[in-house]
Each structure stands twice: as structure tokens, then as C-alpha cells.
Amino acid sequence: MNQPTTAPPRTRTEPKTERPRLWKVILLNDDYTPREFVVMVLKAVFHMGEEKAYAVMLTAHRRGACVIAVFARDIADTKAKEATELGKAKGYPLYFTTEPEE
């Protein structure tokens, strides 16, 4: 005799996807890098317009630091490194860093 078979109940589980933690890219002020060069780097690496780049540069100059943008960690690290390397290549102490957004 055949016994009836019962299939286990089908359940659909949706994987929980969490948003990646975001990281801030921060421009640190120094007294040696020319303002024009900082603006050029902001335009080249962060695709800012002239006015926005100038405003960000002035904010960093007046406050000592300024948040440039917020990205996923790998993008933030890459952009901070690229911008810092542009300064190094010209002999300037221009420095960008990253930290987690709260």
C-alpha cells in the first residue's frame, strides 16, 4: 500500500538587506596648499562646480575641516586617497580623511 506523502510547507523568506554604513570624506585645512589648488582638486575628484568647491574650501579654511561628501566606505576611502595623492604629487600637505557617519 502506498502511504500518502505530505510535502513540507513552503515558506518564503526574504533576505534582510541592510544599507551599508556611510562614511564622510573630510577635508582638513593646512596653511600651505593654495586655495586655487584645493578648489581644483574638489572639482576634479568630487565633481563639484566652481562655486560649491570654493565654498567648501572656505569652510575648511575657517573651521579647520569640512565634510565634503558621504559615500559607502570603499568609495569614500578611494576618493579621499585620490584627492590626497593629487596634493602629494604637487608637494602640498593637502589631506582628506574619512570617518563613519553617525
Which residue ranges define each predicted feature?
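Terminal domain-initiation and capping elements
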Residues: 1-102
